[in-house]
Amino acid sequence: MSTLHVISHSPFGDNRLDSCLRLLGANDGLLLCGDAVYALQPGSTACERLTASNLGPRLFALEEDLLARAIADSPARAVDYPAFVALSLDYDKVNSWL
């Protein structure tokens, strides 16, 4: 069973991202939105952890949030809202890390 994990909180304020990365299954995806896209800042510890997690094509970020935070060079695939909806249907479950 696959799960799309959605994180919207900054990786610098709590440990949601680290907890999520520990629990990710082989078929799970991760979507970063809101302040969570700060995890994609090149050179940050959070970005290094994401890169080391080998998510590859299963790492997504809301394009609108990347643009709003001026994050241009990201290992995540940028998606718009319709693609976010499509992603949520591609996975068996969606888990929002509130």
Cite the ranges covered by each PLM segment.
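Structural motif
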Residues: I7-S10, G34, E63-E64, L98
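Short, glycine-rich nucleotide/cofactor-binding loops
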Residues: T3-R16, A36-L40
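C-terminal structural segments of small proteins and small subunits
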Residues: R69-L98
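Histidine-anchored nucleotide/phosphate-binding helix
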Residues: F12-N27
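Short, charged/polar "capping" segments at the starts of alpha-helices
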Residues: V37-Q41, L67-A70
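A glycine-rich helix N-cap at a beta->alpha junction
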Residues: A46-A70
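Short internal beta-strands
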Residues: D28-D35, P57-E63
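Charged helix-capping and loop-helix junction motifs
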Residues: G43-E48, R77-D80
